[in-house]
Each structure stands twice: as structure tokens, then as C-alpha cells.
Amino acid sequence: MKVTFYGTRGSIPVPDREFVQFGGNTSCILITFSTGRIAILDAGTGIRKLGNDLLAASHEQYDNIIVGLSHTHWDHIQGFLFFKLANDPRRHITLAICGKGRATKDLESVFATTMQDDYFPVALDKIGAKLTFWQPDTSEYIHPRGIGIVASKHNHPGGAYGYRITEGDKTLVYCTDVEHGDEIDSNVVALSKDADLLIHDAQYTP
């Protein structure tokens, strides 16, 4: 399992020189599995460059892509409008929030709203790729390709999900926008236990 960071910022992208070390794009992570298959976590502005890189690679395994969303606040979905693979009719893209408490139709309506003509010139139903909105109502899921997914809700206004992704003996945990409050969120602790890699933001730390 290989992890590539395409966006590490929150709230808004930042172009200023002092942010060059970690980049200026909002949340977007690429996971490349041992089979060569990929998954994307969050669709912030970093997904624009990620899409360009995937097009340049032109690999058939990129025709079916899962984009797992922690939540749908703007900085986690704003790049999807500029994700070039979404305009390619050869692609099948699954947009997903795994975990209990959010309906698939709600997820689709969020994207449809952001692409209304008041905000964007291309409507969701006119986008080129085949889109699937997927929200299994479970906290644990085994993908047919043998990837284990555990989703856990954590403290954030409007709710957000962390993901524990396991391939073979390697485990990645992705928890962003976590607001621990006076005590550490016990859900995050349980989700992260014995992980090989924890991706956790530091925006809300003292």
C-alpha cells in the first residue's frame, strides 16, 4: 500500500510561498494498493492535479475509481468539479461515505447542488463519467478485492467519518477534521489502534 498526499490543507486552498513545504491544496489522498488499483480519500482541490497525473499515466486500472469522503464540507469536495476523469465517459467513479447515518440520496444531492448553473456551468447529470453514489449502512465492509474498511464517526460539526483501511498486514487510518474537545475522542483512539500509518490533522490542537 502506497500513500500520496495531493492536498493537506483545510478550509481554503492557499497559494502563498510560505505554504510550499506541505502544498496549498485542500484534502486529497491517493492510495495505491499492491494490485495497482487505487482509491482516493476526499476530493478537495488536490484532486485536480491527481486527476491530471492519472490521465498522464493512462492505466486501464484507473477506469474504476472509488472516492471515499470523510464528509461533505466544501474543502473536502470542492476539487471534484475540476477532476478531469469525471468528464471522461470511459470512467466509472464511485463517490462514497462509508458508515451509518447518511443517506445515499443526500450525498448525491450535495454534489447536484454544487453543480447547479448558479454555481457551475456543467450539471451533475451532464458530467461525462458514470457516477455511483454509495453509502453502505455499516461500520465495517470488505471490498471484493480484499480491502477491509472500517468507518467511525468522530466529533465535527455536521459529522465526519474516519477510515481504517487494511490490505494484507498493512493498515492505514485517515482521520481529518477531528475536534477532540476536553478529552481525546475515544472513537478515534479505537479506530487508530495498532495502525501502521495514521493521517490526522492538527488544526484543532492547542
Residue ranges and their predicted role:
Residues M1-V173, V189:
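Binuclear metal-dependent hydrolase catalytic cores
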Residues C175-D177:
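DG-centered beta-turn motif at the end of beta-strands
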Residues E179-P206:
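Cap/insert and terminal regions of metallo-dependent hydrolase folds
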